UniProtKB/Swiss-Prot annotation:
The lineage of its organism: Bacteria, Bacillati, Bacillota, Clostridia, Moorellales. It comes from the Bacteria. Residues 101-174 form the PRC barrel domain. It holds the Pfam family RimM. It is found in: Cytoplasm. An accessory protein needed during the final step in the assembly of 30S ribosomal subunit, possibly for assembly of the head region. Essential for efficient processing of 16S rRNA. May be needed both before and after RbfA during the maturation of 16S rRNA. It has affinity for free ribosomal 30S subunits but not for 70S ribosomes. Keywords: Chaperone, Cytoplasm, Ribosome biogenesis, rRNA processing. The PRC barrel domain binds ribosomal protein uS19. This is Ribosome maturation factor RimM. Transmembrane segments: none annotated.
Amino acid sequence: MDTERIGVGKIIGTHGIRGEVKVFPLTDFPERFRPGTRLILEQEGADGREGRTFPVTVISVRPGKGNLILKLAEINDADQAGAVRGATLKVEPWEVEPLPEGHYYIYQLLGSRVYTTGGEFLGILRDILATGANDVYVVRNEDAGEILIPALKTVVRQVDLARKEIRVELPPGLRD
């Protein structure tokens, strides 16, 4: 199992004088921020210095304009809130919300080796683009370059998280 923490929100600013923070959610599960929830705040250090990491507890949450406004128990004023701007709120991998069968988190798929159903190696899944209709897998291969693969059930035939492998059946003309 992955041991790297999973980002669920990005602190993008402060709100008011009582230490509330504006959070851009990185999750499709807003209940992740319900009062009483424990999260891990990770802040990168500047100029190569080590950043800060500490646990925080959500006291309250309410909707903002395109974001959420959170009050965290450990942040008590606007100065403290400003000091954590840019930090990421994370959870441990075993704390992620379970998904229905056949659905995956982006972090689970990135880095997977992608093959055709015939066994041809296409490359490594490096990015996933959200296009509205369906996601698109960005697969890169040092020799063949980049290929964009629609993330459709008719195309993505098998995902093996344990082996970090994805099998696809490319639509005709995709590589022409």
